[in-house]
């Protein structure tokens, strides 16, 4: 039985065993999804700016934690991008990211409002828990699916970070001096954030990462088309256990039993939804 390594917080790109890279073991669908993921992770500074506005006045420790989270997320993007550049020398992280940033910026990132788009700081942290649940399970799936050793290591390191980020936001949710949100309100926020996975962020990042600039005219961006392609590439890595873990973390964030009926039902529905998106 192989025991997966335990990756601690605070790693850098120098800790990754790049010399073990094996181009013969690259899986094309994983390469496509890693390219897109690199752009999303590398976009962390915008999220940091937004969260610092929302949490202004909460104290230096909270702001420092948000800034540290952002540094780690951006590092994830650099690590994934470096691997993708090794796997496909035609891919350039900075060039693809510039195209992505030019075409994708959520409205609440551009504003100056210090109120969360979720309605409260607690609501914002529930949404962040949903995201970290998704990324933790996603990189766990890539780690388990990859036969290329460097990608498996990077994905394992990122998955461990994302789980720690989930715990950070879970604790911050309960630390806010705001009224406790009701269960149905929390569930509504969580479901709403899950549905946002159909927005332009994932589809457009997949487009920018996998369609070279010189092919833009022949292959224009179509959200529905590239959302489906992104979903298909992701499903190549996922197994049901990864979805079940994701759902358990989300259900815990909204205050329900992570091993109860809601988690079981949500796991079935989400798995079916992902299968449908990838067809």
Regions found by a protein language model. Name each.
Residues 1-279:
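Non-heme di-metal
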